[in-house]
């Protein structure tokens, strides 16, 4: 590890820390050590792993100020937002630790009439070693949705944090080491893209990735060379649907927060709003009033921070320019709102659906508000996207009906972001927003495999699965199938 790289504070460019770049050989060694530790981690059993994970969650929250400050330094987000991220993180660790045994309990299945002499069970076992590649926007919360659940299921984990937040990743390993019964259970490796690619091809049994759709496709392709399954949590262009009967004050407050918090760097952040034309003017007026009270700035000075990844400024700028060129209008802010590394709030209205500003993920504090004649039109426009991560609905009476027609992985009715904080429900998307799930029983089962075990309880006189099967037995089977109409299985 002769080569190193630095992480910097995006607000001022100051170096936060220097970290090693793991080579492919070194990544392989770490994965090998994790595999060696795997058998002992499994032997601890659910109760033993639960104790370790609950101790870890306690250690993290007891040192919340330390890790929150590091998150703030590497991402530029306010300390209060970093604290909220940590609090939500420990909730997920605790839930996974407490529920893993129940979720993985052996299930008994009906064998069906034809195989009534058999017992049928399905067992769940850990995969072995899970690789996790994390993002920079929520550097402890998001990867923990894979890490904690994989560990609770009995896997060991090798984690590569984003090159923008390596310090957070190293802190996670150090905090785990403080309570770990032995080495190799959870290990952090640092580096750039080559290190992440090495993890994909290192022999891990599954890989979980959070990041852009473009990079996710490269990750999936690399993992495919070794037939390694993946969980991909990718980008979004999340819509907000505002019906005429919505509580506008609550809808505006939540939508503007969703769009602007964390400098708009949230995969489930509001990027496009479809509001019923009957209340559109009032909604836009309230949105402008709220946005005008917000300011981007360094932690302690702004409501939200800088763009963590410098190149994202170019994407934000190009989308705002495209929106105006294509016929949209500024309702609040202008191109002057973009002053690297900060982006002040921008509200765009009446942007054509074909514009790149509507079609592509912006990942900045920019929101588009378009009028619709009905919720039917809003649903059609919301679904007309290559993304399908989350959605928000604001309506007093139509929420469930609208939700059932949306093509996405998660929906919040009269709320925002809430599905990410509820540990018992799965998080993930469809279409170009990825596949697989984190969180909840579904998320934990991602890091297990099913083993079917069937056993003969009673030996039948009929020779069915045998070369000694007779024509009479064949006729009996067909007659039974006809009478039972498919209920043999």
Regions found by a protein language model. Name each.
Residues 9-18, 241, 342-489:
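Conserved C-terminal structural/oligomerization subdomain of aldehyde/semialdehyde dehydrogenase
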Residues 109-250, 372, 488:
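Rossmann-like NAD(P) dinucleotide-binding subdomain of oxidoreductase/dehydrogenase enzymes
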Residues 13, 49, 71, 93, ...:
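Residue-level signal for inorganic ion chemistry
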Residues 15-22, 36-43, 132, 240-242, ...:
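Short, well-ordered beta-strand elements within core beta-sheets of diverse protein domains
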Residues 1-118:
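N-terminal Rossmann-like NAD(P)+-binding subdomain of aldehyde/semialdehyde dehydrogenases
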Residues 16, 214-352, 413, 475, ...:
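ALDH superfamily catalytic-core signature
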Residues 2-5, 270, 389:
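Short loop/turn microsegments at loop-to-beta-strand junctions
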Residues 35-38, 42, 57-64, 68, ...:
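Structural signal for hydrophobic packing residues in well-ordered secondary-structure cores
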